[in-house]
Amino acid sequence: MHLLSLLFPVIALIPTVLSHGYVSGIVANGVYTAGWQVSYWYDIINKVPYPQTPGWYEEALDLGFVAPDQYSTSDIICHKNAVNANVSATVAAGGTVQFQWTTWPHNIGPVLTYVANCGGSCSTVNKNNLKWVKIDQSGINFSTQVWATGALMANNNTWTSTVPKTLAAGHYIFRHEIIALHGATTANGAQNYPFCVNIDVTGSGTASPAGVAATSFYKATDPGILFNPYVTLSNYTIPGPALWTG
C-alpha cells in the first residue's frame, strides 16, 4: 500500500473532507455490509487492527477525486492507489446493490456502476487486467433538469443498481462512480469518484459480456466530460462504454 503518499498535514485536508463523501457501505441481498472507511487508514498507520470489508482500500484520504488528466492511470480503476479487498459480499443475479455514500454535495453529474469478473479470487487479481462492463448509468432527467447526483442526494445519499439477471455467477468487483460536473466548463474540471467493492454473484445466468479496461473509459474532451452544464439541456452523452443490460 502506498501509505507514504498520505503523510501530509491533516489540517490541510479539512475543507475537502467536509465537502465530499465516499461509499461507506452497501446493501446486497437485503444485507448491509460496511465498506472501506477512511478512518481505517489511521488504524493502519497506528498498527491497530481494523475490520476486513469488501470495500477496496484507497488513499483518497482527503476524499478527493481523479481528474481527467489521470484517466489513463490506474487511479481511475478503483481510486487512488487502490488495493484489493480480502473478503466479498454476495448478491443474486437479478437482485440489487444499494451503494450508501457518507454524504454528497454536488447535484450536477451522472452516476455509473460497472462490474468486472475476477476470473478467480478478487483478493489477488491484478486490477490493471480487469475488464469492466457498465451495468447501470443515469445522467439527467431532461423534463426536470435533475441530475442523477441530485436524485442520489434526495435519496439519503444512496444509489441502487440492479444486477442483470443473465449475468453469470462468479467473483466480481463492482465499481460504483460519481462524475461531478460542477467544474465541467473548464478543461480538467470534471471530478471522478470511483469506489470498488468485491461482490460474489450467484444464480443461473450464463452471460459473460466482454468488457474494457477502466483506463479507456473516458477522455478529457468527451462531450459528457467537458461542456457547459449550466444551461437547459435537451441531450447529454453519458461518458464511458455502452450500457450492458443483459
UniProtKB/Swiss-Prot annotation:
Its EC number is 1.14.99.56. Cu(2+) binds at H20, Y193. Belongs to the polysaccharide monooxygenase AA9 family. Its main location: secreted. Glycans are attached at N86, N141, N156, N235. It is an enzyme of class 1 (oxidoreductase). The keyword Ribonucleoprotein does not apply. This is AA9 family lytic polysaccharide monooxygenase D. Disulfide bonds join C78-C196. Its cofactor is Cu(2+). O2 binds at H182, Q191. GO terms for cellular component: extracellular region. Lytic polysaccharide monooxygenase (LPMO) that depolymerizes crystalline and amorphous polysaccharides via the oxidation of scissile alpha- or beta-(1-4)-glycosidic bonds, yielding C1 and C4 oxidation products. Catalysis by LPMOs requires the reduction of the active-site copper from Cu(II) to Cu(I) by a reducing agent and H(2)O(2) or O(2) as a cosubstrate. Binds 1 copper ion per subunit.
